[in-house]
Amino acid sequence: MKLIEIFRSLQGEGPAMGRPALFIRLSGCNLNCEGCDTDLKPSLDLSVLELLKRIEGQGKRVIITGGEPTLQMNELVDLICRLYSRGMEIHIESNGTNTIPLDILEKIHCAVVSPKKGSDF
């Protein structure tokens, strides 16, 4: 997976707002929003298994964000399934432009969809 960063912080959106979480920020976006605060260039390129090793023992709440996570759909589905099988509380933040399969959405505790008006949208 192409990642920008992995970091711990407090969740700022949704029902887990104010709670500690581990953030996995994926690179790439299909919009070009004016004022975007995310550097979309990847700094890490890890397999799903390598990513899981890096985050092991860092808490039970994981926020998958971006960029736009659904641009790496195959790896995203694999990651969500593996996190789910480990009993993780999974949150995802998306711009809502791509569909996540229903069977995968059912494994996610919270999906925050934040539509944006990019120049290519």
PLM segments and residue spans:
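Conserved AdoMet/S-adenosylmethionine-binding subsite of the radical SAM
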Residues: 52, 71-121
